[in-house]
Amino acid sequence: VDWTEGYTGSLTNVYIEHRQSHDKGIEGDGFNTDIGNNSDPVFWSAPTITNLTINGLGSSNQNEAIRLRAGTRATFNNVLLEGFAEGFDLDDTETGIGVLNGETSVTDITFNDITLTLKNDTGATFNEADVISGIGNGTGADYNSWNSGWTRN
């Protein structure tokens, strides 16, 4: 999953099975860092993600489940992350400002085989408790409610 340029929609019952050729489950940008309104953004991305599961390849692979950068904000509810070196990697000053303003949060999450739950590379001062609550309460996507008849390749 990849968002940018002020995306503010909702994602529900998201199931991501990580593959060898990918290094992240989600990469969320507030604006496109190559083009766009990045010199003085008017809008930041601020999606709401509910019932999310990301299965990685194991914490020894040094991959990130979720990277938030370039000023994105995001609200996560009911998350299950498994098999990553980093659960959340937050980058860039504007992303940190979103955390300090209460515009980025994670509620009800379970971390399995995650080495570091939150990495703060924003320059802003905050800790895990300022972003994440309800550790151990996340069950993730309701996979069984929609997977009947689907096949995996």
Please provide the spans of the model-predicted regions.
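Extracellular beta-rich repeat passengers
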Residues: 2-153
